[in-house]
């Protein structure tokens, strides 16, 4: 299987200026610097072209949009943890956007997702992913081999 193209592995979320909980956007995976990364993997590994776009591909965007209703930023008091979200700790969280999909190279989507996750894990950061379909954890689990 040929390697994915050299363009960026991720792209900004679909809705302009909408990251998860308004955390900073960082799509340059080669200059990645954070303790926690949020990443959308909207597509799974489709069996055919008809399965590429469906409602589950909208999940990362919907979760990001709903995050405004869940919490009003990292300074918001969370009654479940009896503190602010990051509790005053110096924890850097970034949203790295969504893994790019290319309808001409469907077989490379999981490879891109795995490569992006591996880049996050190789920095020592934790990764939170929003999918897509039931297969989204597969490339993330494969990327754990870097640890």
Can you say where each PLM-predicted feature lies in the sequence?
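Metal-dependent C-N hydrolase catalytic cores
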Residues: 2-147
